[in-house]
């Protein structure tokens, strides 16, 4: 019986801590350069919570499917290049 293709773990070293699978990193890299700033800031804020990372990728995939021909708005989608309320890392003591 033929086996379904498996997801490849990891991406580049700097992306290892953020996304577990290379496909997730590719999706984030593509979409984060094209989404409106408000959506990007919301996703950056959600990425600070490990439990919401899968939800961010799912929303990014849906956005990518709906906006397949979206123009590039920025060179990079990282926190350093896109300061804002979503880029501030929160220190919370429980």
From Swiss-Prot:
Cellular component per GO?
host cell nucleus; virion component
Q: Which UniProt keywords apply?
A: Cell cycle, Host nucleus, Virion
Cell compartment(s), UniProt:
Virion; Host nucleus
Instruction: Just give the chief location class.
Output: virion
- Superkingdom, according to UniProt? Viruses
What InterPro entries would the database entry show?
Lentiviral_Vpr-like
What function is annotated for this protein? Seems to function as a Vpr-like protein, since it mediates host cell cycle arrest in G2 phase. Cell cycle arrest creates a favorable environment for maximizing viral expression and production.
Task: Give the protein's recorded name.
Answer: Probable Vpr-like protein
């Amino acid at each position: 019986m033929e086996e379904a293709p498996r997801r490849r773990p990891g991406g580049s070293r700097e992306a290892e801590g953020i996304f577990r699978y290379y496909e997730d990193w590719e999706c984030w890299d593509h979409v984060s350069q094209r989404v409106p700033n408000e959506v990007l800031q919301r996703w950056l804020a959600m990425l600070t919570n490990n439990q919401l990372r899968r939800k961010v990728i799912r929303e990014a995939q849906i956005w990518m499917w709906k906006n397949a021909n979206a123009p590039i708005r920025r060179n990079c989608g990282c926190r350093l290049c896109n300061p804002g309320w979503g880029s501030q890392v929160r220190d919370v003591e429980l």
